[in-house]
Amino acid sequence: MESSQMSNVFHATTIVCVRRGDKVAIAGDGQVTLGHTVMKSNARKVRRLGRDGQVLAGFAGAAADAFTLFELFEAKLEKHGQLSRAAVELAKDWRTERRLGKLEALLVVADKETSLVISGTGDVIEPEDGIVAIGSGGSYALSAARALMAHTALDARTIATEAIGIAGNICIYTNRNVVVDEL
């Protein structure tokens, strides 16, 4: 990408989802970057979805695309009432409706039983170890969360929070202003 184009690209965010015991937590940083400039340091990229707020969600990618992905997923969740079914139905729409195209965003969603990554191209992925991370600092957060899970007795919320903090120390597009929610 040319440097003139690069200066107009939004870089955001790091999201991590951690399961331990009967708890699941999703954490995200608060930084939104345009080119080489931090535009906002306290953005909220983690929220609750569904009628009773029993689904956690966090997004990374282009903000407008992420909000579109949120809305599409939440509509499926309202209609079907179950996380996995809503994700599969959304993926089916991608395969049949050309108008959806390609959204440049990723969504992590979790309820008490399941964690999923939903991509802006209609892919649905379930992590095998209960830990998933997306976004610019996702690799760092994933590594940190896996190490903390393997070598400590910390709870899901603390692991998620610490993983974002560690990613924020390494990734220039991630800060340590953490928002975390837990079921």
Curated annotation (Swiss-Prot):
HAMAP family in the record: HslV
Protein name: ATP-dependent protease subunit HslV
InterPro entries in the record: ATP-dep_Prtase_HsIV_su, Ntn_hydrolases_N, Proteasome_sua/b, Proteasome_suB-type
EC assignment: 3.4.25.2
GO terms under biological process: proteolysis involved in protein catabolic process
Class of enzymatic activity (EC top level): hydrolase
GO CC terms in record: HslUV protease complex; proteasome core complex
Alphabetized GO MF terms: metal ion binding; threonine-type endopeptidase activity
Classification via PANTHER family: ATP-DEPENDENT PROTEASE SUBUNIT HSLV (PTHR32194:SF0), METALLOPROTEASE TLDD (PTHR32194)
Keyword match GTP-binding: no
Binding sites annotated in the UniProt record for Na(+): G168, C171, T174
Function: Protease subunit of a proteasome-like degradation complex believed to be a general protein degrading machinery.
Active site: T13
